[in-house]
C-alpha cells in the first residue's frame, strides 16, 4: 500500500539537511555518576524506548552547580555503540581555555603547545584536548533507540579514562572474536566493525588531578565479552549493522565537529572556532616535526605560511 509519504523518500529530489546536534552528558558527581539526557534532547532525537529497556536507568532531575536544573533520563549502565572518536589516538580538538575557543586539531596542530611554551616559559598551558564522541544508545538487540546520533563531549581525565576503558573493551572483544572464529591470534578490528560493537559500561566516580582534584565519572566496569557470548556484543540483524556503518561513513568528525562548535558558540558563547582552522584535513602525526612540516601560521588568521 502506497502512501503520500513515499514521494519524500526520493533522495535525489528531496535532500536532507543536517540539524543541530544534541549532547549526551556525563554527570561528574560522586553519588550520581553516569550518562544523562536532558528532556529537550529526548524530544529532539526521536527517542523511542522505555526506561526499563536499560539496566540502572531512571527518570531524574539534575541540579547543576549554578542552581539550574533539568529533567531527563539518567543511565548508570548505558548500552552504547561508539561510532567515532572512542580511542585515545582518534581525532581531538585543541581548545584554548583562556579564550574559550577551538584553535586546532590534535595531533596535526600540536605545534600550538610548542609555541605557547616558547612564549610563556614555565607557565601552565591554556590548551586542552576536546573529544567529540559520536554515539547511539541501543536496546538489547543492538537497535538504536533514537533517530539522531548523540555527541558526547569530553576532555581531560574524563576523556582519558573513558578511552582507556573503551579501548580495553575492544581488545577483549577482538580476542573473544578470534577464539570464537578459530583464529590462532587476534587482530585489530576494522573501524566499521568497532563502530557496531555494543559497549555497556557501569560508571563510577574517582578523584582526578594532581594538586586540585575533582570528581570525574568514568566506566569503572563493563560487560566483558567471551567466545561464548560474543554475538551479544553486536546487533542481531544485518540491517541494523548496515545502518550503523552508513552513519559511520557519512558522518565522520570532519562533518560533525564544525557545526557542533558553531552551535556551542551560538547557544552558550564558548568554543568559537579560530579563523583558519581547517576541519577537512585528515590529522597527521604530531610531535616536534609538525611545526616544521606545516610551516608558520599567521598570528591573526591562523593560515599556514610556507617559505
Across the structure, where does each feature detected by a protein language model lie?
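OB-fold ssDNA-binding interfaces and closely related basic DNA-contact patches used
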Residues: 1-154, 186, 213-215, 226-233, ...
